[in-house]
Design a protein with these regions (language model features):
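N-terminal metal-binding scaffold of metallo-dependent hydrolase/deaminase domains
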Residues: 1-40
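Conserved beta-strand scaffold positions in the cores of enzyme catalytic domains, especially
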Residues: 6, 44-48, 124-126
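Divalent metal-coordination and catalytic microenvironments
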Residues: 10, 24, 29, 51, ...
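A cross-family glycoside hydrolase active-site/sugar-binding cleft signature
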Residues: 22, 96-100, 126-128
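Active-site metal-binding motif and surrounding structural segment of the metallo-beta-lactamase
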Residues: 39-55
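Metal-associated gating/positioning segment near the N- to mid-region
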Residues: 52-106
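Histidine/acidic-residue-rich, glycine-tolerant segments that coordinate divalent metal ions
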Residues: 103-137
């Protein structure tokens, strides 16, 4: 399978502009460049996105779960992995799994699970207080 892909025939949204007649060059999980369609290298497999939008991955800084998975209800590596995969399919490339105010024991379990999971998508944990502050316990 070719690891060099050119996403073309779509609208490309960059930080500053919207580009037509361009392609996004990708190798594995890295964006290499945005080039005019006429400059797509010969060793790239062209993927026609059929007029779709091409934009940077989205980031969600407070998410409790996705689909049937609620992280605080199932504090497991498997649950976190399912959340990762579901969010990636939806265009969310980074996120913060969130736990609502809870017991210290639940927070400690969540931290342990997060460390074991070694997620490449989750940026860290969002733990809601006020019980993180010793003076408020």
């Amino acid at each position: 399978m070719n690891q060099n892909l050119a996403l073309s025939n779509g609208r490309i949204f960059t930080e500053y502009q919207v580009l037509d007649n361009h392609a996004v060059l990708v190798n594995r999980d890295r964006i290499l460049a945005i080039v005019p369609v006429s400059e797509i290298p010969g060793d790239f497999e062209v993927i026609d996105v059929q007029g779709g939008n091409i934009c940077p991955g989205l980031i969600d800084l407070q998410i409790y779960g996705t689909g049937n998975d609620l992280f605080s209800a199932e504090l497991t590596v498997e649950s976190l992995s399912r959340i990762d995969n579901n969010l990636l399919k939806q265009g969310c490339t980074s996120y913060m799994p969130t736990l609502a105010t809870n017991t210290l024991a639940v927070f400690k379990t969540a931290i342990d699970v997060f460390r074991k999971a070694q997620s490449k998508v989750a940026l860290g944990l969002h733990l809601e207080g006020p019980f993180l502050n010793p003076a408020k316990r």
